[in-house]
């Protein structure tokens, strides 16, 4: 399996049978083989996770499939791509024989994706995160904690080969909560931080915290756009 960090929350995963492109909206993409199907995911409608530029990929990739969150308006899909597009709801499962994907409800907008392909389990959180904001109304934060933990509890006992999880420095001292909660429910072999707004040191900061002692060796430190890994 090959993984490439594109930008923000965008990653490309290449398995034996398919490409999976998550939350792409800008920056240069690697070259794709036309022999493999390309699955393009958009977790929600926010412009840092979805752009109509993804539909331009259809011109070069005849085996393309779009899996979009339910909150993205269907009218934003060009006519030429409608038959290649599926919309996914929380709790819904799509399975085409190559890829199986399940949706989980985000604590912000849209969904998170749990993908099964070639015997691999791949999780992309989108904006499903523990958005605990300093200075926010205490009851709002309490509700957020409850909502996030209840949703990831639905994944309890699962094993993920890779998990793409938000690690947002804008949350201040609470930036780590989403990942810290997640690993209590899911056994993730490798954790790729995302949504860190160019602050690449957030992974290192988390790895230095006592709470990460049990999983810090699974956190991948990202240093630049276009960086790749083979697993």
Question: Locations of the language-model features?
Answer:
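Short active-site oxyanion
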Residues: 1-2, 62-66, 190
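Active-site metal-binding loops of divalent metal-dependent hydrolases
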Residues: 24-26, 44-45, 71-72, 106, ...
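Short glycine-/acidic-enriched loop or helix-start segments at secondary-structure transitions
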Residues: 31-32, 50-53, 77-79, 134-135, ...
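Hydrophobic/aromatic beta-strand patches that form the interior of the parallel beta-sheet core
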Residues: 41, 67, 86, 102, ...
